[in-house]
Regions:
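Post-signal peptide N-terminal segment of mature Sec-exported envelope proteins
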Residues: 29-58
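Bacterial signal peptide processing site
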Residues: 22-25
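C-terminal motif of bacterial Sec signal peptides marking the signal peptidase cleavage site
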Residues: 17-20
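Eukaryote-biased recognition of intrinsically disordered, low-complexity regulatory segments
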Residues: 60-71
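Secretory targeting signals
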Residues: 9-15
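N-terminal export leaders
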Residues: 3-7
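Structural signature of tandem-repeat unit edges
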Residues: 52-55, 70-84, 93-109, 116-131, ...
Length: 288
């Protein structure tokens, strides 16, 4: 009887051990699957491959357009062979492109190549991009990082990017936000302008209907005609370093009376009425 009891206990222990082992394997498999899924997040470029056969080429290293097969692709990586766009990838209604990457991190001559892409939601520019950026009329583009080396964006460079909510400037090389650069970016909610910028030109942020918060650059010298016209900004932040700022009577036309935050005892604090008149309400902040 004692032997039977011991034998029964042994079998039970073995069964429990096997169950625990299988459960551990299942958890391990689930963990491995989750790790694989997590490692894929934000790594779309690694999962896509450059294919030179998706393009029509002009010479050895310039892309003229997408061919029929390329137009069907939702994700495209520009091959490292390419150095420039000869024309543009759009605006053909048959172009299905939603995400665009570059195989090389080297500077790329964009020209008008990334404009009028009606369905594109995501563009990742080369890390070492320095040439001018122009993505106007990319209606579904949601965000864009401007690489640190970029020193200019085109006039009308983001015009009519109506889904654009976020622009991140990763460096401080820009001197000018040019004419109509963000005209009618109706989803843009907030922007921090690089401290290197000295001039915000005519209609730069006009008709940005969702824009609520603007952080001005330290080296700002002038704000052009209609720069923020019809943009209902609640809060503008002006760093203490700003001096001798020139503002036109219509720089903030049809915006309502926003809050203009300045640092106490700064040049703008002391000259607020001369610079802004009745354009906005003076408020104070700590400059951070």
């Amino acid at each position: 009887m004692k032997r039977r009891t011991l034998l029964g206990l042994g079998i039970l222990a073995l069964a429990l051990g096997l169950t625990a082992c299988n459960g551990g394997k299942e958890k391990s498999a689930q963990g491995d699957s989750k790790q694989e899924a997590d490692s894929g997040k934000g790594n779309e470029k690694a999962n896509a491959k450059a294919n030179e056969d998706y393009f029509e080429w002009m010479g050895e290293d310039s892309i003229a357009n997408l061919n029929e097969e390329g137009s069907k692709q939702k994700v495209i990586v520009i091959p490292k062979r390419a150095k420039s766009f000869d024309s543009g990838l759009g605006p053909d209604d048959d172009v299905q492109l939603e995400e665009l990457y570059f195989e090389s991190d080297d500077d790329f001559q964009l020209g008008y190549g990334l404009t009028l892409l009606k369905k594109v939601k995501k563009i990742v520019l080369p890390k070492n991009q320095t040439s001018e950026v122009d993505v106007q009329s990319d209606h579904n583009l949601e965000s864009l990082d401007i690489p640190a080396g970029v020193s200019s964006i085109a006039k009308f460079g983001f015009r009519d990017c109506q889904s654009l909510k976020e622009v991140n400037f990763l460096g401080e090389q820009l001197k000018v936000i040019p004419d109509s650069a963000f005209l009618n970016c109706s989803a843009l909610e907030k922007i921090s302008i690089p401290n290197s910028v000295e001039s915000i030109e005519e209609a730069a942020f006009q008709d940005c209907k969702s824009l609520k918060e603007v952080h001005m650059p330290k080296n700002l010298k002038e704000i052009g005609s209609g720069a923020f016209a019809a943009a209902p900004v609640d809060s503008y932040y002006f760093p203490k370093e700003i001096e001798n700022l020139k503002v036109l009577p219509d720089s903030f036309a049809s915006t309502g009376k926003g809050n203009f935050y300045v640092v106490k005892d700064s040049w703008l604090d002391k000259n607020f009425e001369d610079v802004f008149g009745i354009l906005g309400e003076k408020q104070y902040y700590d400059g951070e």
